[in-house]
Swiss-Prot record:
One of its GO terms (biological process) is killing of cells of another organism. The keyword Secreted applies. The lineage of its organism: Bacteria, Bacillati, Bacillota, Bacilli, Lactobacillales. One of its GO terms (cellular component) is extracellular region. It is found in: Secreted. This is Bacteriocin curvaticin FS47. Keywords: Antibiotic, Antimicrobial, Bacteriocin, Secreted.
């Protein structure tokens, strides 16, 4: 991820979350996207 892609992922966490995160619902997707960005 670049910094821009990271921000985009955080901004659309419900869509850009990892598969495992998405399986946990919106909150899981948010965490998945944020962890990937970091």
């Amino acid at each position: 991820y670049t910094a821009k892609q990271c921000l985009q992922a955080i901004g659309s966490c419900g869509i850009a979350g990892t598969g495992a995160g998405a399986a946990g619902g919106p909150a899981g997707a948010f965490v998945g996207a944020x962890v990937v960005x970091i």
